[in-house]
Amino acid sequence: MRDIQDFDSLMIRLASPDTIRAWSYGEVKKPETINYRTLRPERDGLFCERIFGTTKEWECFCGKFKSIRYKGVICDRCGVEVTHFKVRRERMGHIELAAPVSHIWYYRSVPSRMGLLLNLQVAALRSVLYYEKYIVIDANDTDLEPMQLLTEDEYRDAHERYGAAFTAGMGAGAIKTLLQNINLDELAAQLRAKMIEKGAKSDQRLLRRIEIVENFRASGNKPEWMILDVIPVIPPDLRPMVQLDGGRFATSDLNDLYRRVIHRNSRLSKLMELKAPDIIIRNEKRMLQEAVDALFDNSKRKKAIKGASNRPLKSISDLLKGKQGRFRQNLLGKRVDYSGRSVIVVGPELKLWQCGLPTKMALELFKPFIMKKLVQKEVVSNIKKAKLLVEQEAAEVFAVLDEVVSEHPVLLNRAPTLHRLGIQAFEPVLVEGKAIRLHPLVCKAFNADFDGDQMAIHVPLTQAAQMECWTLMLSARNLLDPANGKTIVFPTQDMVLGLYYLTKERALPEGKKERLYSSVPEVLMAAECHAVGWQEPVLIDYETEPGKIETVRTTPGRILFNEEMPEGVPFTNYALNDKKIRKLIENVFKDKGPWLAVQLLDKLKAVGYKYATYFGATLSMEDMIIPPEKAGMLEKANKEVLEIYNQYKGGHITQEERYNRVVDVWQKTNSNLKEILMKRLQEDKGGFNTIHMMETSGARGSKDQINQLAGMRGLMSKPTGDIIELPIRSNFKEGLNVMEFFISTNGARKGLTDTALKTSDAGYLTRRLVDIAQNVVVNEEDCGTINGIEYAAIKRGDEIRESLSERIAGKYTLERVIHPITGELLIDVNEYITDETAKKIEEAGVETVKLRTVLTCESKHGVCVKCYGRDLARNRIVRIGEAVGIIAAQSIGQPGTQLTMRTFHEGGTASKNVEENRIVFNDYSIIVRGIKGSYVTLKNGHFLFTRKGEFTFSRVLNEYALKKGETALVSTGTRVVKGNPLYTLKNGKEVLSENIAIAEVRDNIIYLTGQEQTIEIRNGSEVVVKENDVIKAGETVGTFDPFADPILAEYDGFVRFEDILPGTTLKEEADEETGVVEKRISDAHFDKMQPRIFISDESGNTVGEDSYFLPGGAQLLVEEGQEIKAGAILAKIAKESVKTKDITGGLPRVSELLEARRPKSPAVLAAIAGVVTIKKGLLKGKRTIMVRDEYGHDVKHLVPIGKRMLVRDGDTVKAGEPLCDGSFDPHDILNILGENALQNYLMKEIKEVYDAQGVTINDKHVGIIVRQMLRKVKIVSVGDTKFIFDQQIDKYRFHEENKRVKEEGGQPAVARPMFQGITKAALNIDSFISAASFQETTKVLTNAAIAGSSDELRGLKENVIIGHLIPAGTGMKQYRDIKLFDKNKSDLDIQMNEILERRRLEAEAAQALEEKELIEEENFLDDL
């Protein structure tokens, strides 16, 4: 027989009345539950033993049959079957209804399924079901319409006029008849014809109707089954009744709801038998309908039925829904046996793979194992005595305990478990006390500290589970963070300080030379005798690499450090701060393997703690040195602020500009003070100032925090995020005055509230991500795709944020990579790129590499090995069965909580990058290649840009000035790689290139330049250089106003206003403080008028074709008729005042991107590339912009009024370029630029939020989530497929159907990709079990039942819910069905038969023995 657990899919359907009767073991006729005197169930009641099975094991109700030997006998007196009481959990009953009722899920949920089928509005359907109106079922030859609603009076009139010529009815019965009359095939054909006829004008309702009809047709469900003639009664042990102390009963709410239904049902039957008046019966039927509604879904009703304590009763739907529902409370999260929890304390003496387990806990957790061992060792004779011994905590027990615990791993978990490293396995070491001891290095992964955190402990029981713990989950095997592949186990805080102190070097006093020592023992002895300081530089002959001895300049501390390290760790001769320690661990891990890395970590921990203790760092007020320059700097800043205020008073600048400039001054002052303070601390005590050491080593504190202690606290922000322009000039050492203290309360409080609120947000984000990606598992070696994405280094301006080698390592190539100069093959197609190959490719000067990525993977379910590439947590190629979807979701969700919790350490100080007012390249020289755009040439030869332009340049990597007699070997335009000769010296020796570059030779100087780059030049910028100039580092290229965006005239002439009318579109306000009149454009009348400026010549003719549109809020700076020169400022728009960026901006931003929300006021993007024409006049209150492409096609774009235009007449735009300001709408990017552009945009945006917080997340994690969001397509043209216009369909199903149609010679369908938010995508997932356990449970189940959905159980979640092993790792089908076979088959068969026969005999013997014991026991009881 197949095991009940052995099934591959699960189907859900509507139950027909016959099915419900077939499930049932009898009809429940009475509302009684149990007899209050005997406390036994009432016959035919809700707990009846005849229907649901006996309450006493192997005994009937009346007691006639009492024994297992009567198993299966049905008692002739009471009718109860002799069986086990557990059947009361599975046997169902039913209630035969006196009148049909509607199922609330199918008529009440939105959209109403019944309403769609019958094409009735919900209100109309309700009025029929609740017996308020009649509905015409059959109109025959009357002038009534079928499905017409009639009130009581209208029905009477019709009856008098037509008599029995028509049929009408009310209630569920009438609806049932209508549903029975539907011919689904005909209806489907009619609706499809209507859809084709309407075409693009068809509405959503029509699409929904077709979908529901098709679902009914495909599933074999009948529409009339949505009306119930009989309702099932769930087994009594699932709605129990429990006696409390004091004789009262606690009962499940379902019993109350069932009782109401039975009451009303029997009353209705009686009334119908008595032939009561119609109105009474109708009322009773309505009440029955309400009672059944409440039973199925009490929360959907307007007035929920309340129980005794005036709380709404929990109906069947409520038992499934929400966090406390069956799905999330009992199926996805169960309480686990063999577990305990306790407070954690630090265990510095432990090895990395150990944890300290309190003896008391171990006794309880390993109880069964101890008992077994005691019996095995013959300490006791049976299990009962062993149990007693354990409970008494006898000495023998402790002797056995050590044996049991050793080499039996345990799992430790710290809530919240945000990523997979929140649960790790350790080898337990017994400790005294009641606290669990945790190794200090694993705290980072658990995010644990020892301020009272608790951890849970679990014991893996089976051999397979223990094996998994040792091989996969052991802490020593999880050194890397799955989110980015960097180490997550590394020393922090005290350990870092200890290591930094030990390896730091003190400067020698002037005139003193390093002493020379011959051997390691000599140096260490000298240091211990204080002949030389631990940090003093010395010279020593030392073995830096195996077999290589050289004289090195180092310190005794570093020698000691290297001696302590395990063999194989490279010689380390520098001061170790946190970053360098991590680098050292990473290098050892990569070069020497994980085992040496684990030994290294334990050594680092020991040495770090030891020398931190010897150092004994303390903080003193003396260590906080307030720079003497502070007073002068504040004085200077005050003067600057006063000057800005005077400019404002004179009306030269606006209020916003004044505010922005003041904030800017204080920001600069603060950052300058910080730099000086850091310098002072560094010079103090020869670099051994404790605060300075803590900060530089990375042990504790940041530059900003130290600045608040000894510099100045700086600017604070209001709760709204605006910066308060009054800075806090004091620091904590000087103390704040009352005003300053009051200002800082804002930030401090905001940090704490944010933390509390945002933690739940991050948790919810993780939950949504897991739900969408949980079924993505690596399930094949190669999907065979020919698509991929081009990767290049990520640059911000000119600084490389992520190098090419970092980005491509660990992925597979899609195309060959050829050396750009030598033409040799660096790596072939479909090859894995190792770290070494990646470096080689980068050094060869390759700019871009086309790779396979998860985004372009074509695996039908999950992803393939070659598109995924490296498993970051293990630093090797991913294995089939890895649950990469969950890892991706955790990698994005887990830092989310850190993002939220980051705010409160800073205490709300405002931080913003100081905006420069010039274009400058500080770190390198450049050669100007081109200046493009619309500009006016000024008298001094500078270019003033009247619109945005482009500045193209090449970076100078090296320059070589040739002296007399030296000859260049390259000419302008030569490509050189590392090692190519550049020029010869006088002596004929060649100088070689150190870079990959392009050479340029001018005036006897060889410049090696990088690739050409382009930056955007802002409107209003003045560029002071010309093409082909060589600009030295730090020289100004151009200047601009960072606080305002000007509108500039492009021609000489006279100003002419249009639609600029004082009082309507022009507001004139006198500033109260300064008395200066400010003229601003108001956007109140933009629907009728468009304020703009023309420039005309003396005779009044317009010069040029352009007019200058003025957006709302612009400040007007010219008068009508005023004569102006090209480049004059006509108006300017102040930039928004800057708010502090808090991660609050971060998390909601990630949420917004992942939910695919359309931004509030999105930018309008150009649909095609071409030339812009702005049309006069308005269309529907919007401005019309035409873009004409090179073939003469025009595309119309509508821009809302009041939006700031980014283009003008005659501008050339690229497809996807914004025409007005606003944020990008991802849906527009998808429609205009396609899937790859959208993926790149989302990747960039999401990673930017995390980068701002210093969190790195690998592309592939974001890629998996984005791929899941792009799984659906929308049908644009149906062709000969079964699809419906506008239907949303899974990409792979779409391709399959098209393939089928093409093979049959038909016309395939056309679809456009859809971008769904994570919540929506999770609800539209193929598995209805997973979707129902996520959100909107009833809606998902309703739809699934109608469609007769089958869940293939592919994902992890649905398998957890039904209690299967998850299809990932060793639980995958291909691993579970492995069969071992012997080459000599005949022997195997004989062996198998012998084993089976032996097992059968053993089972029979055991059963016989059990029955014999039971009978003996019963006979003994009978004798008694």
UniProtKB/Swiss-Prot annotation:
Its EC number is 2.7.7.6. Zn(2+) 2 binds at C783, C857, C864, C867. It holds the Pfam family RNA_pol_Rpb1_1. It catalyses: RNA(n) + a ribonucleoside 5'-triphosphate = RNA(n+1) + diphosphate. The keyword Kinase does not apply. Its cofactor is Mg(2+); Zn(2+). Coiled coil: none annotated. Keywords: DNA-directed RNA polymerase, Magnesium, Metal-binding, Nucleotidyltransferase, Transcription, Transferase, Zinc. Binds 1 Mg(2+) ion per subunit. Binds 2 Zn(2+) ions per subunit. Mg(2+) binds at D449, D451, D453. It comes from the Bacteria. GO terms for cellular component: DNA-directed RNA polymerase complex. The keyword Nucleotidyltransferase applies. HAMAP family: RNApol_bact_RpoC. DNA-dependent RNA polymerase catalyzes the transcription of DNA into RNA using the four ribonucleoside triphosphates as substrates. This is DNA-directed RNA polymerase subunit beta'.
